[in-house]
Amino acid sequence: MRLNLETERLILRNLTPEDYRAAFLWCGDPDVARYMVYPVYTKAEDVRTWIETLDPDDPDEYDAGIVLKSTGELIGSGGIYYRPDDDLWTIGYNLRKDQWGNGYAVEMIRALLKYAGRTREIRGIQGTFADANNRSRRVMEKLGMTFAEDVTLTKLDGSASYPGKRYRRIFR
Protein backbone atom coordinates (compact mmCIF):
# COMPACT_ATOMS: atom_id res chain seq x y z
CA MET A 1 0.00 0.00 0.00
CA ARG A 2 1.27 3.47 -0.76
CA LEU A 3 2.10 5.23 2.48
CA ASN A 4 2.84 8.71 3.71
CA LEU A 5 1.84 8.83 7.39
CA GLU A 6 3.02 10.81 10.36
CA THR A 7 2.94 9.98 14.05
CA GLU A 8 4.14 12.11 16.92
CA ARG A 9 7.78 11.17 16.26
CA LEU A 10 7.85 9.31 12.95
CA ILE A 11 7.21 9.59 9.25
CA LEU A 12 6.12 6.29 7.70
CA ARG A 13 6.65 6.08 3.97
CA ASN A 14 7.40 3.54 1.30
CA LEU A 15 11.02 2.56 0.90
CA THR A 16 12.61 3.53 -2.41
CA PRO A 17 15.67 2.01 -4.09
CA GLU A 18 17.58 5.16 -3.13
CA ASP A 19 17.18 4.14 0.55
CA TYR A 20 19.43 1.12 0.17
CA ARG A 21 22.52 2.59 1.86
CA ALA A 22 20.54 3.69 4.92
CA ALA A 23 18.72 0.33 5.03
CA PHE A 24 22.04 -1.51 4.87
CA LEU A 25 22.83 -0.05 8.31
CA TRP A 26 20.29 -2.44 9.83
CA CYS A 27 20.09 -5.18 7.17
CA GLY A 28 23.86 -5.56 7.25
CA ASP A 29 24.17 -5.55 11.04
CA PRO A 30 24.55 -9.10 12.43
CA ASP A 31 22.94 -8.08 15.73
CA VAL A 32 19.82 -6.77 13.95
CA ALA A 33 19.63 -9.71 11.52
CA ARG A 34 20.28 -12.35 14.21
CA TYR A 35 16.59 -13.28 14.60
CA MET A 36 15.24 -12.00 11.29
CA VAL A 37 14.29 -14.48 8.55
CA TYR A 38 16.79 -12.95 6.17
CA PRO A 39 20.50 -13.70 6.52
CA VAL A 40 22.71 -10.71 7.27
CA TYR A 41 23.29 -8.74 4.08
CA THR A 42 26.95 -8.39 3.16
CA LYS A 43 26.50 -6.00 0.21
CA ALA A 44 24.46 -2.81 0.16
CA GLU A 45 23.47 -3.50 -3.45
CA ASP A 46 21.62 -6.63 -2.29
CA VAL A 47 19.51 -4.45 -0.02
CA ARG A 48 18.62 -2.33 -3.05
CA THR A 49 17.52 -5.49 -4.86
CA TRP A 50 15.29 -6.43 -1.90
CA ILE A 51 13.72 -2.94 -1.80
CA GLU A 52 12.98 -3.17 -5.53
CA THR A 53 10.88 -6.31 -4.85
CA LEU A 54 8.49 -4.42 -2.54
CA ASP A 55 5.15 -3.66 -4.20
CA PRO A 56 3.66 -0.38 -2.94
CA ASP A 57 0.43 -1.17 -4.79
CA ASP A 58 -0.27 -4.46 -2.97
CA PRO A 59 -3.38 -3.81 -0.83
CA ASP A 60 -2.41 -6.63 1.55
CA GLU A 61 1.06 -5.31 2.39
CA TYR A 62 1.68 -2.08 4.26
CA ASP A 63 5.49 -1.82 4.07
CA ALA A 64 6.93 1.25 5.75
CA GLY A 65 10.27 2.91 5.99
CA ILE A 66 10.58 4.40 9.49
CA VAL A 67 11.93 7.95 9.43
CA LEU A 68 12.65 10.08 12.50
CA LYS A 69 10.63 13.25 12.15
CA SER A 70 13.20 15.22 14.16
CA THR A 71 16.20 14.40 11.92
CA GLY A 72 14.84 12.96 8.67
CA GLU A 73 16.93 9.80 9.19
CA LEU A 74 15.65 6.47 7.90
CA ILE A 75 16.14 4.19 10.93
CA GLY A 76 14.23 1.02 10.11
CA SER A 77 11.42 -0.68 8.27
CA GLY A 78 8.42 -2.79 9.03
CA GLY A 79 4.80 -3.27 8.31
CA ILE A 80 1.60 -5.21 8.54
CA TYR A 81 0.74 -7.95 6.07
CA TYR A 82 -2.67 -9.56 5.56
CA ARG A 83 -2.66 -13.37 5.57
CA PRO A 84 -5.99 -14.73 4.28
CA ASP A 85 -5.27 -18.31 5.41
CA ASP A 86 -5.93 -17.28 9.02
CA ASP A 87 -7.62 -13.90 8.40
CA LEU A 88 -5.00 -12.09 10.49
CA TRP A 89 -2.45 -9.37 9.85
CA THR A 90 1.16 -10.34 10.52
CA ILE A 91 3.41 -7.65 11.95
CA GLY A 92 7.11 -7.21 11.29
CA TYR A 93 9.78 -4.64 12.05
CA ASN A 94 13.50 -4.06 12.28
CA LEU A 95 15.44 -1.03 13.37
CA ARG A 96 18.99 0.15 13.52
CA LYS A 97 20.50 -1.08 16.76
CA ASP A 98 21.13 2.47 18.05
CA GLN A 99 17.36 3.06 17.85
CA TRP A 100 16.26 0.02 19.87
CA GLY A 101 14.27 0.62 23.04
CA ASN A 102 12.63 3.89 21.99
CA GLY A 103 9.14 2.52 21.26
CA TYR A 104 9.35 3.18 17.52
CA ALA A 105 8.17 -0.30 16.47
CA VAL A 106 5.04 -0.03 18.64
CA GLU A 107 4.35 3.50 17.38
CA MET A 108 4.72 2.37 13.76
CA ILE A 109 2.50 -0.71 14.09
CA ARG A 110 -0.25 1.25 15.87
CA ALA A 111 -0.23 3.90 13.13
CA LEU A 112 -0.37 1.32 10.34
CA LEU A 113 -3.23 -0.55 12.02
CA LYS A 114 -5.19 2.69 12.40
CA TYR A 115 -4.52 3.62 8.77
CA ALA A 116 -5.38 0.18 7.37
CA GLY A 117 -8.44 -0.05 9.62
CA ARG A 118 -10.04 2.88 7.81
CA THR A 119 -10.60 0.76 4.71
CA ARG A 120 -10.01 -2.83 5.81
CA GLU A 121 -11.47 -4.98 8.54
CA ILE A 122 -8.73 -6.02 10.90
CA ARG A 123 -9.87 -9.06 12.85
CA GLY A 124 -6.53 -9.47 14.60
CA ILE A 125 -2.75 -9.37 14.46
CA GLN A 126 0.01 -11.89 14.97
CA GLY A 127 3.77 -11.93 15.07
CA THR A 128 6.61 -14.31 15.77
CA PHE A 129 9.88 -13.84 17.59
CA ALA A 130 12.82 -15.95 18.73
CA ASP A 131 12.62 -17.08 22.36
CA ALA A 132 15.87 -15.23 23.04
CA ASN A 133 14.56 -11.95 21.58
CA ASN A 134 13.02 -10.32 24.64
CA ARG A 135 12.82 -6.92 22.93
CA SER A 136 10.40 -8.27 20.33
CA ARG A 137 8.39 -10.02 23.02
CA ARG A 138 7.99 -6.64 24.76
CA VAL A 139 6.91 -4.95 21.51
CA MET A 140 4.17 -7.52 21.07
CA GLU A 141 3.07 -7.27 24.69
CA LYS A 142 2.82 -3.48 24.37
CA LEU A 143 0.56 -4.06 21.37
CA GLY A 144 -1.72 -6.17 23.59
CA MET A 145 -0.65 -9.47 22.05
CA THR A 146 -0.40 -12.68 24.07
CA PHE A 147 1.12 -16.14 23.60
CA ALA A 148 -0.59 -18.30 20.97
CA GLU A 149 1.88 -21.12 20.25
CA ASP A 150 5.47 -22.29 20.17
CA VAL A 151 7.08 -22.22 16.72
CA THR A 152 10.39 -23.03 15.07
CA LEU A 153 11.80 -20.15 13.05
CA THR A 154 14.16 -20.81 10.14
CA LYS A 155 16.22 -18.35 8.10
CA LEU A 156 15.17 -18.11 4.44
CA ASP A 157 18.50 -19.56 3.37
CA GLY A 158 18.24 -22.41 5.90
CA SER A 159 21.41 -21.30 7.70
CA ALA A 160 19.83 -21.28 11.17
CA SER A 161 16.73 -22.40 13.05
CA TYR A 162 15.72 -21.45 16.55
CA PRO A 163 12.78 -21.85 18.92
CA GLY A 164 10.28 -19.06 18.95
CA LYS A 165 6.83 -17.93 19.95
CA ARG A 166 3.80 -16.71 18.05
CA TYR A 167 1.78 -14.01 19.78
CA ARG A 168 -1.70 -12.87 18.73
CA ARG A 169 -4.34 -10.34 19.51
CA ILE A 170 -7.89 -10.78 18.25
CA PHE A 171 -9.90 -7.57 17.96
CA ARG A 172 -13.20 -9.00 16.66
Question: How should these model regions be labeled?
Answer:
Residues 52-65:
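A short helix-loop-beta-strand connector motif used in the catalytic cores of GNAT acetyltransferases and
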Residues 39-40, 63, 156:
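Sparse recognition of residues in long alpha-helices and their boundaries
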Residues 31-53:
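Conserved GNAT-fold acetyl-CoA-binding loop/helix
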Residues 1-34, 67-172:
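Acyl-donor (CoA/ACP) binding surface of acyl/acetyltransferases
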